[in-house]
Amino acid sequence: MAYSWQTEPNRTEPQEDGSDTQQFHHTNQHLSSRQVRLGFDQLVEEINNKTPLSESEKEEDTYFVPDAPNLGSKWPSIYETHPRYFSEFTSQSPDSSQLRFGKLSAIGFNPAVLPTHQLIHEGASWRNPSGKYHGIEYPRFDALPPSSTGQGECNPQGQSGTKHHNYCGEHEGNLPHHHSSYSIDSIPNREKRRSGDVNLVEPSLEFSKDSFLPRTSENVSVESTEPIGCPIEIVEVPQGSNKNLASFCNKVKKIRESYHASDINSNSGKIWAITTAYPSRLFADTKFRVKISIDNSAQLLLLMPHANYLVKDLIAEILLLCANEPLSPKEYLLSVCGSEEFLQMDHSLGSHKIFQKNKSVIQLHLQKNRDTPGKLSRKSEDDHSPFHLNQLLEFTHIWKISRQCLSTVMKKYNLHVEHLLKPQKDMEEKHLSSMVSGNQHTSQPHVNNVLEEVKNICSVLGCIETKQVSDAVKELNLILQRPSQNFHQNSETSKKGFIERVTAELSRSIYQLIDVYCSSFCTDFQPVHTPGGVSHVHAGLQSHLSFTVCSLHNVPETWAHSYKAFSFSCWLTYAGKKLCQVKSCRPLPVTKSFSLLVNWNEIINFPLEIKSLPRESMLVIKLFGIDSATHSTNLLAWTCLPLFPRQESVLGSRLFSVTLQSEPPIEMIAPGVWDGSQPSPLTLQIDFPDAGWEYLKPESEENRTDHEEPPRECLKHIAKLSQKKSPLLLSEEKRRYLWFYRLYCNNENSSLPLVLGSAPGWDEETVSEMHAILRRWTFSHPWEALGLLTSRFPDQDIREVAVQQLDTLLTDELLDCLPQLVQAVKFEWNLESPLVELLPRRPLQSIRVAHCLYWLLRDAQGEAYFKSWYQELLAALQFCAGEALNEELSKEQKLVKLLGDIGEKVKSASDPQRKDVLKKEIGSLEEFFKDIKTCHLPLNPALCIKGIDRDACSYFTSNASPLKITFINANPMGKNISVIFKAGDDLRQDMLALQIIQVMDNAWLQEGLDMQMITYGCLSTGRAQGFIEMVPDAVTLAKIHLHSGLIGPLKENTIKKWFSQHNHLKEDYEKALRNFFYSCAGWCVVTFILGVCDRHNDNIMLTKSGHMFHIDFGKFLGHAQTFGGIKRDRAPFIFTSEMEYFITEGGKNIQHFQDFVELCCRAYNIVRKHSQLILSLLEMMLHAGLPELRGIEDLKYVHNNLRPQDTDLEATSHFTKKIKESLECFPVKLNNLIHTLAQMPALSLAKPAPQTLLQESCILNKTRTIQRVTILGFSKTHSNLYLMEVTCSDNRRSLTKKSFEQFYRLHSQMQKQFSSLALPEFPHWWHLPFTDSDHKRIRDLSHYVEQVLRGSYEVANSDCVLSFFLSEHIQPTLEDSPFVDPGENSLDKSPKVQLLMTYEDSRLTILVKHLKNIHLPDGSVPSAHVEIYLLPHPSEVRRKKTKCVPKCTDPTYNEIVVYDEVLGLQGHVLMLIVKSKTVFVGAVNIQLCSVPLNEEKWYPLGNSII
């Protein structure tokens, strides 16, 4: 990757000694885990354990440092404080300095190249994690040369530091400057004497050749620390102390400022009806029936506008009809009665979904004040409200720090420090101490108080105790324990000076702890300081990544008892792939101080050059514990962080919270997967090098656009590979091939996600080439960019281009992919990315988008990861939405909470008590509406509700016991609204399935095909809870089967009979038949593509108007339930013989089945054109945590069902096979039977008997008395059906047919219903042999019917009798059939064959579609197959044949016949012969030169072979 190192102006580059540094690097790199070099802190601990403080050697090491305590560093190391002396020292002792400081001598800094004193001192102690303070017992810090010359050499910086850092100058006089006379040259020799042959190297200074030089940290920079006596002040930071979140707040504020509340276009406050793009031919001749109500008028206006009529034109027409004076249409709006939804002025009526789905009379309301903002609009006060993220976030973290709490503790600390440093005389005068006798213990009580407050400060800050704090505490205690004789001549003064210095260092370490805490975590406070700059040092792009893992803070006591040691491992990852091998550290036990912690101080060096690291690289760290009993290593926690946030590297010391979740999701590792900036019980401290670098975009080569024309075979292969649609579905070899020919790819033969996803890596050259392709690519549609927001593309530039494309989508189009965009946030690099900016901005323009996004973000917070980012994004949305909308959303949230509590109580109650529990809990909902008056329905923001219909509420008897809740519509012109509230079921998968189905339906509508689909609303409102829209007048297929008797699922006329009972008029029946025809075809396609499983008659619903739809998508993508290894769902989709029976009207209109197959295949091929979009939508949900969508195999399943690589002919043939396979699958009926039997006991308790259906459904006018019924004849082909003519009292006649069994069931029904009345005797079912039984039965039945109709008036006019004779009427002709056979006259009875032929690349492809009106010579029904001969044909095999369709006069094949090596059509004849087994049925010869290619055509069949 390209990185730019920032250096100070006019800085000279030092010379490096390659041989020395190489030698040191070699030594450092080959250390094993047991040979990791010790730091000085461990050396001091060893010395302290062996040598008492009173030994003379310790006394010799006593020294003083001529450094004012107000300088912003702790007791600095030699080279930090006096660079020139260090330079001199290194020149005198090159060998020892090389061993001690490694990289430093190689770089060879001199004062001219060092940064300013502020940068030298700020945070220096943090970059010295293993160092000790200057004190009498620490031999590593030797005194500086005492000469005045030496001091003078550091005066420029020292004076500058004194000048700029002296906040409390009156105390400066109390700081004596002492100089030690100990020789600096003896340091290496003494270290060698004490440690043997081991080179002891300070971890924070130990760097290999290619590691970073330690510098100061940006986030812990303190340009000046507090001198003695100056308190540490904490100030409020409303925008947040974390610069990332503060920057996010500013970004969101700018977004809202760009949309003023006074802008009526973006802030209308109204909910606009959803529109979709559709071809005008879809409703070319359609007119809608519209009823218009007008303010201050009780009269309704009935109009029939054309579908292509614009809404504003309709308003103008209404005003023209009703107004007495000319009115401007611009001042009016049309709303949908019963809701708060408004039609969009510049759109046609037909483009509104409400008109597309609702074919009945639509009621609209005309109202004025178009320019008046709605009740949900933003107010001017909202424009001036500040955005403080901490006020909106609802974090539930354990360590939520209060500014007041920390300020209180800090005041106590400052007070005790002040008391400690007061002169003895002042202490006596103010009576602040009663323990003033004796030199040894005078200050001890105050020291104890100070240390207690230090402990409290650390406790408030998440029990974080840095090494600097610990060392300062130890130093303070040790100085007080030091005998007076060990100090200089003036013991009191000397000791006082040391106490002042140590307390100053303690304050400084606390200050730095607070500063680093505030910069690492999100707080609303920070310490008072002047921010300093950052030193960017050029260490070379060949440098290796290096950092120090310091310590783990606040280790739980249970861990300390259970685990004997702790270790960590770390690695780098990018786009879900590891970039390097895992690095591990040595295990160390827990140490005890103020709290339990583990001090590793482990330097990690990755053998990766800076320039080779992708910009979006992530560091993952896992923490392990070694079990004390089993000695096994257990994963305890983990965290992750970006290496280059905000285009720059991580600098200095940082604190990171860790999560206790089991395993890090490798494929989802991104900055938001675990927000380390949010405090948690465990905190990890990591010290990064203070050298920084900036990322620069690599320059791409644009001169490669001119290339030679690719070979034709190459283009064909590219197009073939591009049919995979997703790079996840391409093998490594195919991705290499596609990338090799990337310059030949364009939007006509490929897609951009596929091309960029085939890149071999993310090195600088490859990324440069990817960006070049990105710039010159032309998107075919914004939907194509969706694939660039998946987890495979972490590159920020690529994602930015994708968002730019998606931002061009219309508002209603954006709703179709909003759930995926919420998921795509997971893989953004920060909260200022273009996608995160788009999500709060688009809701400013649409209430519907804001409402949808709110509930998506609410639901997303229940996911295991990324919760913090979603909370912050939700806070931004609420800030932008304004007070009015937020109040409504708050009401909805309270409603959801109430329903969730009720659902849990009903579910947990016993079966007999559930009804009483529900009635009792409904009262809480009534109280809720008394308080808030009205509330919008979370399922649909356009619906406003004001109460509960108590009597209409109930619950379902399924496992989750979902509630049926009926709300009272707040709109007086609207009906009550019934919904299902589920508690205990995850509805996110249902939402996704319905979303994809809606996308398919939109694709059909855009192609002019209305499949009469019902896609009900579904909304997940949290963990395992949500709303489901109830479709009015819908009933499950199981209930229909149940009312047909025990074996209802096995009967073929069940569905037809039910529709006949509910649609007595001919036009109603035909409408229901048409709706079923289209909706059944649509659901066959969508359930096949999505692999919807667990299909049975309880998951299929029907409406009286004929619409069929599926519910419950808990099992999809082929994840079928199994019993004993056998799948329950063995059919590709649900299409049974009873559905075919209804479509073909009992087998009388077989051509309707052909039309059904044609419709299914057409719908299937339309959806296949949108395979890229469907697969992208699914791929973006792979990491949403859905139970059935988790991996590549699930995508492959949908891809295999879409078959984008097939031609339309091949896909047609494939889907036709699936239709036949489903039709012949008997286990489907068996499964329905099992479900029906399982529900019979439950339903029998609730409802008496099957006749209830007749009583409810067949409510006919009793004045329509049947005058007579005449049996005209019978047919043996369909179970001895008797054809009857029914004459009613109004002389209307109709035909119907019934079987003897149906007559018997009618008689049994009447016996049960009229048990007290005398009924005529029913004819016997048996007859003597050798008699004309059929004609005799006609006479018996005629006599029986006559007695029934002339008998009791109550019986003759009962619902069951009227329904029996007046339902299932027969249409005398097919002239008014709702099915249209394109290009054919249905009255033509001549035999025909339908073919479709294509010719390309010497290949002749023939699709044999259908045969029509074929019979055997004796008139019987054939079992036909088709034989095809190509004459002449060069190969020996000339004959090709289709499969046989048994016993059918209008068989459907949709089989493909292919002839290769056909060099031309001229001179070729296609001979087609139809046979039934070996019997000739018909034939035709076709001259291929005259055939219209790529068109369907019917060819007449002759009765002989020519």
Swiss-Prot record:
Q: In which tissues is it expressed?
A: Expressed predominantly in liver. Also found in kidney, lung and lymphoid tissue. Down-regulated in BeF3 cells expressing the BCR-ABL oncogene p185.
Provide the PIK helical domain boundaries.
704-880
GO cellular component, alphabetical, reads: membrane
Region listing for Catalytic loop, in residue ranges:
1091-1099
Q: Where is the PI3K-RBD domain?
A: 285-371
- One example GO MF annotation: 1-phosphatidylinositol-3-kinase activity
Annotated keywords: ATP-binding, Chemotaxis, Kinase, Lipid metabolism, Membrane, Nucleotide-binding, Transferase
User: Which parts of the sequence belong to the PI3K/PI4K catalytic domain?
Assistant: 949-1227
Q: What does the record list as GO biological process?
A: chemotaxis; phosphatidylinositol-3-phosphate biosynthetic process
Name all C2 PI3K-type domain ranges: 541-689
Q: Does the keyword Transport apply?
A: no
The enzyme's E.C. designation: 2.7.1.137, 2.7.1.154
Q: How does it sit in the membrane?
A: Peripheral membrane protein
Which CDD domains does the entry mention?
C2A_PI3K_class_II, PI3Kc_C2_gamma, PX_PI3K_C2_gamma
> Main localisation, per the record?
membrane
Chain segments carrying region Activation loop: 1110-1136
- Record's family? Belongs to the PI3/PI4-kinase family.
What this protein is called in its record is: Phosphatidylinositol 3-kinase C2 domain-containing subunit gamma
Q: Which species does this protein come from? A: Mus musculus (Mouse)
